[in-house]
Amino acid sequence: MQYNHTAMADTPLVSVIVPIYNEESTLLELLEEHGVVDNFRRLARADRQPPRRGPLYTDSDLYKWMEAAAWSLQVRPDAKLEAKLDELTDVILAAQEPSGYLNTWFVDERAALRWQQQVSGHELYCLGHLLQAGIAYYRSTGKRKLLDGGIRFVEYLLREFGPAPKRPLLTGHPELELALAELYRTTGDRRYLELAAYLFSGVERERLKLRERDVAYMFSGKPFTERRQLEGHAVRALYASTGAADYVLETGDEVFRRTVLRLWEDFALRKVYVTGGAGARAAGETFGEAYELPNRQAYSESCAAIAGMLFSQRLLHLTGEAKYADLMERALYNGICSGMSSDGTLYCYRNPLAAPANDRIRNPWYDTTCCPPNLQRTFTALGAYFFSTSREGVWVHFYENAELKWRLESGTGMELAVKTGMPWQGETEIGVSPQKQEEFTLFLRIPAWSLATRVEVNGQRVREPVRPGGYLALRRVWNKGDRVRVEFDMTPRRVFANPRVSEDHGKAALQRGPFIYCLEKHDNPDVDVFEVSLNGRAGLEPVRGSGALSGAILLRTEGLAYDGPLSERPLYEFQPAAPRRRVRLVFVPYYAFHDRGPADFTVWLPCVNCGR
């Protein structure tokens, strides 16, 4: 059953086990070590010491870390962490000017450059993350101080910028639009939503003398509703599209609605990696052409995978269609989880789908440090993605051990308790306990990869058809203590790309549940992972991981290797080289690549005997 407009409502953060999140991560210590916090402290000192350090957008890194910490407080109260956030709030706001302006780069000798570099200056980008941190802290603790500081900056913008005769304004890096929509939801002040509409209007292109290439790269500077495809900087384009989807959710604007749906189709059908990653080209961190999805050269920035998930989440709420949740899940368990090591101390800026051992992808620090705190705020906020409510009932989008205590649209309190082996095992039980007997619908997402799903309610198999890639609508009178059992199909399968993806033509990847797998040298020391093929006639055997991969499921299968190194063969021959030597192969989840140290790895392999 499809719902054209579900009017879903967010539920609060819920108790969810997120194994990849490490509360003891030292990211704040690294931000301190590299001067990010001192950049604020110095502005409250007469001598302006120490000198400012880092790129012009480092303010946002601290704001993102604060948002992550704020969301974690909602699930796990921590007095020490809350006191640290209060301290940082005071440090930040001590640097705010009486006008409301707040930025640690455009000060002193650079103050004259304010708003003169709107294409690349990141002033509004940093403000967006300040607002999101303030909103998160307010929702978690009720404290408004940081939020009010962000609002003062927005009020400054409203006074100074807008259509002529005011000064022109542009989001050179979209992000503020999302924050303004959330600020409107938090305060009810429609002026903030109208400011987002002004930014989407693109009316200032002439006054700002924008070049066509900048308009494409920024995904800003022309009317958003004229966009026909995702192009330019991947994170910018997806953040802009997410903000536009937020605008649709709050206004119902039909032209914006058609635009965001069109852009998502371009993304999902032509420009997203099998891992949920986005951004084919390192040059400019940009999208490529349709079906341009290289593997070793893939940029696939961690922030872009996060942005893609955010965009899909908004459209899930707009439409109630499971395809958006499917893409969210693909990104989360693959292209997002790969961005952080399992111990939470190493990060990926880019996430290629193949790389040699000498490609240093995971690092503790980057000069551009947008991804680490973005990953942290994503993981600490995950509980908000698992459930939604609507007039009809409750929606379950993802399955992890979680508890929801919330209320139906009627006001009746209810609890859901999910106990599951997911994402590794398919057995799932959902306890449904309304405070009083009530009729409503429980919408269960059936992932597209689960081709044969069994569902029972109180021991009786449901009669409704259970289709992959949709929501199963269980409408009934629910009573306290009702139990829903779901068995998802965890059969490992080969995945094939659209033939237009030239780099993956004749190749296959492996998937089990939500996880995409890769072949890594650590587990296949006697095989050149770049010169081996899958055997389409061989079985795919799930096996339990050990050591650093304890708790994970690996895949074992048979492959076919060449008799000798391909480097010793002629460049051109009259007969094709054929792999014939049988070898055992072990695949690990993609998110774990280089987690045990650098090693050759690849996701896509040539597939012999792989007729569909």
Please report, for each region that a protein language model flagged, where it lies by residue.
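C-terminal beta-rich recognition modules with glycine/proline-rich loops and embedded aromatic residues
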Residues: 196, 260, 326-334, 339-431, ...
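N-proximal low-complexity "stem/linker" segments adjacent to membrane-targeting elements
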Residues: 1-28
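Hydrophobic core segments within long, regular secondary-structure runs in both alpha-
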Residues: 66, 82-96, 128-131, 147-158, ...
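Solvent-exposed loop and edge beta-strand segments that line ligand/cofactor-binding
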Residues: 46-62, 112-126, 143, 159-173, ...
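Well-ordered alpha-helical scaffold segments within catalytic/enzyme domains
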Residues: 64-79, 128-143, 176-188, 239-254, ...
